[in-house]
Regions:
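Bacterial carbohydrate/catabolite-sensing allosteric modules
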Residues: 2-8, 15-203
Length: 203
């Protein structure tokens, strides 16, 4: 990719999973002088459009606790390389503390945003005889996997176990039952990114 071939660039930084690759791409874009806007993650020296993952996950966790009365909440985290995953996980921990729900490390699982991560966590919870009242997932794919595995093991969703996702991608709508999720409104973010670049590149 030669940045000079473009009038402007939208950088979805966290689609570059490897940190060194992120660093090299960001440095090259900065040096190019081409207008760049980062979507989803703050990047020094660039404009940024960022979704408030922390606030949205806080609302989701608080809803599960306060509206549904759940006190035993498992959490499936996203990859450590993703800043959005870190914000979502911190929101889960903070809301538990604020609502007087003890944090239990045995209900906090590392995931990788895949369907398989959701199925694995449920199989582990069932093996330990620790199926919770709710499973909060850092994205929709893991939520879909969790629901599928729960159903395979005879649990009803949401009657026996609540499961929530995040991102509102197509799998959330296509799943049965539909996944309760957070809409990150990526269409609006993309529109605003284009607007920003158009103002920067206008002659």
């Amino acid at each position: 990719l030669n940045p000079q071939n473009y009038d402007g660039i939208i950088l979805a930084r966290e689609t570059l999973h490897e940190k060194n690759m992120q660093r090299r791409v960001v440095e090259r874009l900065r040096e190019s002088g081409v207008p760049v806007i980062s979507v989803g993650a703050k990047t020094e020296g660039m404009g940024c459009i960022e979704f408030d993952d922390y606030h949205a996950m806080s609302q989701m966790v608080r809803h599960v606790i306060c509206e549904h009365g759940a006190r035993k909440l498992a959490y499936i985290d996203g990859p450590k390389e993703y800043s959005d995953a870190a914000k979502r996980a911190q929101a889960y921990k903070d809301v538990l503390e604020e609502e007087g729900v003890p944090f239990d490390s045995h209900w906090f699982f590392k995931g990788d945003y895949s369907v398989e991560a959701g199925t694995y966590v449920v199989s582990e919870l069932d093996r330990m005889h620790r199926i919770p009242e709710a499973i909060i997932c850092a994205n929709d794919c893991m939520a879909a996997g969790a629901i599928m595995e729960l159903q395979d093991r005879g649990y009803r969703v949401p009657e026996d176990v609540l499961v929530t996702g995040f991102d509102n991608v197509s799998i959330a709508k296509d799943n049965s039952p539909r996944i309760t999720t957070v809409d990150c409104d990526r269409e609006t973010m993309g529109y605003r990114a284009c607007e920003y670049l158009m103002t920067k590149t206008a002659k």
